[in-house]
């Protein structure tokens, strides 16, 4: 029995096909300014803001920027459009460097523009699906859809209940409206320095690819986002303070293998950044799928696909041209539910690097646009069955990761899954809750290539928005329920994202300023040392009075009139030169013949090698003794001269007593040196005593040796 329609479920008015003509025809940088003009000039017709019915959709404005559910939004001021972002973004907009919130989840019913194969057609209304034959009366009757939308945040099932999300679009909304709610705020965050991730999730044939890429009549989120990105780049580059680099990569995950969609693209000079590394690639498959790429951990990006082609783009047209090249290589096939079904997960990676021209610092952030393949039932075709199994496996792994990530928050706040009103659906809803609150702390990111690539985004390195596409028809109720369960869990995943760090390029004005400051500090330190040197009248170790006086004269002569650094270097060189001369005198071994006749006789008695070695050793010792004696005599003469002169007290006072102390230390070292040499001589005599006794003995051994 068909229930009586509520006011919110009345048949919507048909929409004019000419409404899509207002959509901008080109996503280039030159034409994207029309988007902001449309936003400023679009004025919706006023209506009663307290009305709870959406039957007024027949009087909606034809502006492509008008939100479908704007009339039911009590926060909108009448007379002008106000694009309201998700609550999680608005609540945390005060924090410029960090973002704290959750994954933004939006629901989009299957668009009417999406065609299907065989007898499946697009959704004709938000409440009714295709007509079916009535056997009793022989006429066609509409089968009512079990899902309907009450406002811009709620989607309701007749038996299960209602689901609330950040935003629920009407079935007749345009891609431009979806872009205004989802993608545009993410581009703003990208320009601020945050990583941003947008992915479409849903069953096959529900409109994911149409939402992300669009068609010839209606642009999708990817071209609209690219246009808005380059428009902001042009505006921020006009003052000359910043410059931007945009690099694109495009990959797909087909049967749990990663392939580069830009590798076989047309070569353009200077556009290719990196050549795929064969070290981390598998060999090309025999079926022409290209070279499989591998995922590796990366300190900067979390994970990185090794060998993925990167193309530098100067305009939105160039970037969209590369995306079109990748789309031609993407795996697409016909299924029971869709004439052109995506058989792989496709991810567009747009890396934006902004450089501050003044200080040379740069910041890189990445926009990830993911068009996931849809879950589907088993089919009779062997190839499609194999593809579907890999797709379902990766989506199951993604659901498991989302479930475990949302477990903590679901325990404290409660699941977003509504309580069923029928006993038949109680077990399914309860199982969903139990899966989301699994006590395990392990997050199985490595169960699939998809979750491995999304690991940095889901673990807090990116702001995430998901667009869950659903089919509200009765025969797709099970798949729609699974999608909404996934969306409910995703809404509970907490995010705490920080801006990407600023990187210094090394040869910028900031480093120059730091170098200048370092040199300035060194100069101040040298000036301070010179000032202390003038006050103390010495530098370093005062070896002699003449050296101190000459050093002071050099500094005095050049300290005021010349460069103070030059005076300091001259003084240091003089001290070092004096030290070097003394060391050379002490270490040089002269070749003066030995004067001790007894030692000479002993040396001649020994074998040639031993005698030569002993003679050389004695020569060195005698040379050192002579040098020490000369040095000691010089110091003694210096002391005697100071004592005899009448300026001894004045000299000592001028040197602050330091020279006397140093001279006394030198005398002590001299005494120790003499004592050490005497000790060495005693050891030598003790060592030579057996040889002398042997020489004086009448034993015939000595005569035989000779």
Curated annotation (Swiss-Prot):
Complexes and interactors: Might be dimeric.
Gene: KIP2
BP-aspect Gene Ontology terms: cell division; microtubule polymerization; microtubule-based movement; negative regulation of microtubule depolymerization; nuclear migration along microtubule
Domain Kinesin motor: 102-493
Record's compositionally biased regions (Polar residues): 127-139
Upper lineage: Eukaryota, Fungi, Dikarya, Ascomycota, Saccharomycotina
Described function: Required for assembly of the mitotic spindle.
Region (Disordered) residue spans: 1-139, 413-445
Coiled-coil annotated residue ranges, if any: 507-541, 569-589, 612-689
Keywords: ATP-binding, Cell cycle, Cell division, Coiled coil, Cytoplasm, Cytoskeleton, Microtubule, Mitosis, Motor protein, Nucleotide-binding
Identification of the protein by name: Kinesin-like protein KIP2
Record: residues binding ATP: 202-209
Compositional bias per record (Low complexity), positions renumbered to this chain: 1-28, 36-63, 414-441
Remaining remarks: Present with 656 molecules/cell in log phase SD medium.
């Amino acid at each position: 029995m068909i229930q009586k329609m509520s006011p919110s479920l009345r048949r919507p008015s048909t929409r004019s096909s000419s409404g899509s003509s207002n959509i901008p025809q080109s996503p280039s940088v030159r034409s994207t300014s029309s988007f902001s003009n449309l936003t400023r000039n679009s004025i919706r017709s006023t209506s009663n803001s307290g009305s709870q019915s959406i039957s007024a959709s027949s009087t909606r404005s034809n502006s492509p920027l008008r939100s479908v559910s704007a009339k039911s939004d009590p926060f909108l001021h009448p007379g002008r459009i106000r694009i309201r972002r998700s609550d999680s973004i608005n609540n945390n907009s005060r924090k410029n460097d960090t973002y704290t919130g959750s994954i933004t989840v939006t629901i989009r019913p299957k668009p009417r523009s999406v065609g299907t194969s065989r007898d499946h057609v697009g959704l004709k209304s938000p409440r009714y699906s295709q007509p079916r034959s009535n056997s009793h009366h022989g006429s066609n009757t509409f089968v009512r859809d079990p899902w309907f939308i009450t406002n811009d945040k709620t989607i309701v099932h007749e038996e299960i209940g209602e689901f609330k999300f950040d935003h629920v679009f009407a079935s007749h909304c345009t891609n431009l409206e979806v872009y205004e709610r989802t993608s545009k705020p993410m581009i703003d965050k990208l320009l601020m320095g945050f990583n941003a991730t947008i992915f479409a999730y849903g069953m096959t044939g529900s409109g994911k690819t149409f939402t992300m890429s669009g068609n010839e009549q209606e642009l999708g989120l990817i071209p609209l986002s690219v246009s808005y990105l380059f428009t902001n780049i042009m505006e921020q580059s006009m003052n000359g303070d910043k410059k931007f680099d945009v690099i694109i990569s495009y990959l797909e995950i087909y049967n749990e293998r990663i392939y580069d969609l830009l590798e076989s693209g047309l070569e353009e000079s200077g556009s290719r950044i990196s050549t795929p590394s064969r070290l981390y690639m598998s060999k090309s498959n025999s079926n022409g799928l290209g070279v499989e790429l591998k995922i590796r951990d990366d300190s900067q990006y979390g994970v990185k696909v090794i060998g993925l082609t990167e193309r530098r783009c100067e305009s939105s047209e160039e970037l969209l041209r590369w995306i079109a090249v990748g789309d031609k290589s993407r795996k697409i096939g016909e299924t029971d539910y869709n004439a052109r079904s995506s058989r792989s997960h496709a991810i567009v990676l747009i890396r934006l690097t902004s450089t501050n021209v003044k200080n040379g610092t740069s910041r890189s952030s990445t926009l990830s646009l993911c068009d996931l393949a849809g879950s589907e039932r088993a089919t009779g075709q062997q190839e499609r069955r194999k593809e579907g199994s890999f797709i379902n496996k990766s989506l199951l792994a993604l659901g498991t990761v989302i479930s475990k990530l949302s477990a903590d928050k679901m325990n404290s706040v409660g699941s977003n899954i509504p309580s069923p009103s029928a006993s038949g659906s109680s077990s399914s809803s309860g199982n969903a809750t139990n899966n989301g609150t699994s006590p395990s702390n392990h997050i199985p990111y490595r169960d699939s290539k998809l979750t491995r690539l999304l690991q940095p985004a889901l673990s807090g390195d990116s702001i995430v928005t998901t667009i869950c596409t659903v089919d509200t028809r009765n025969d797709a109720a099970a798949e729609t329920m699974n999608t909404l369960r996934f969306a409910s869990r995703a809404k509970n995943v907490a995010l705490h994202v920080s801006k990407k760090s600023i990187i210094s390029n090394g040869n910028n004005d900031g480093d120059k300023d730091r170098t200048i400051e370092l040199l300035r500090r060194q100069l101040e330190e040298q000036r301070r040392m010179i000032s202390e040197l003038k006050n103390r009248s010495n530098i370093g170790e005062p070896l002699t009075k003449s050296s101190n006086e000459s050093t002071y004269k050099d500094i005095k002569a050049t300290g005021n009139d010349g460069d103070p650094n030059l005076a300091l270097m001259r003084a240091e060189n003089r001290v070092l030169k004096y030290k070097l001369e003394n060391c050379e005198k002490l270490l040089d071994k002269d070749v003066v013949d030995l004067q001790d006749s007894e030692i000479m006789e002993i040396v001649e008695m020994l074998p040639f090698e031993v005698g030569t070695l002993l003679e050389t050793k004695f020569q060195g010792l005698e040379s050192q003794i002579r040098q020490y004696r000369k040095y000691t005599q010089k110091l003694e003469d210096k002391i005697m001269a100071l004592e005899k002169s009448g300026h001894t007290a004045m000299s000592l006072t001028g040197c602050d007593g330091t020279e006397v102390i140093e001279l006394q230390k030198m005398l002590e070292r001299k005494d120790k040196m003499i004592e050490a040499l005497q000790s060495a001589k005693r050891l030598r005599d003790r060592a030579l005593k057996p040889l002398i006794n042997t020489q004086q003995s009448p034993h015939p051994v000595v005569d035989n040796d000779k």
